[in-house]
Amino acid sequence: MKEKLQTFKKTGVVVFENLLDKNKSLKIFNKVLKNRNWSKKIFRTKKEVIKYPQYTKTNPGKGICNYAEEFNLDFIEKNKTIQTFLNKTLGDEYEIVLKKFVVAVPDAWVPNWLKEKVNKFLIANLGGYIKKKFRDVTYFRGIDYHQDIIDNPNAKPDMLTMYVYLNDVDKNMSPLNVIEKSHILGPTVFPHIIKDNINNEFLMYGKSRKTLRKFKKKQLIS
């Protein structure tokens, strides 16, 4: 644990591999998989979106349209290693502000009329285009580097995000991409000032274009 805490302090990122009960993880994953027809059928029609556009409150919240809250996640939340790590980093009185399922939407699911729009305007969160009854999970289709404090702009930066992969994730399955040590700059305005190098392990990031610094990119696959 000491090594994990040191890594987190140094890089802002830490990975725990093979920590959870795989059977319990897959049981939840399979139940989610069978919950609905994961296809173009979860999307609203173009006519409906134009007539009734929705840009806010289209994602699950705490106690609000949240499929993840229907599951017993004690094997995650009460895992001794996880609890110890969170106690050491956040303090003994930490609380879970929000837990939700995040779904990576493949191109095959996106209706043809919507593909051009989401590509042109780099729309990552598809909640506003999803039928209301299916908005109990968050739907992402690629997303720029960002800090999760963007969802709580008036909050203190005393929070962390924990991602749990319920199934194996490879580089073609929208894995989490992080920038190691970028936390040392603290909260910065989105969209962030980043000069990416597509075929390089590093990118340039800073609070202004005059103060860009070199940071290492990391892709989290399992």
Residue ranges and their predicted role:
Residues 1-10, 17-145:
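Non-heme Fe(II)-dependent double-stranded beta-helix
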Residues 20-22, 102-104, 108, 150, ...:
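Short, solvent-exposed loop/turn segments at secondary-structure junctions
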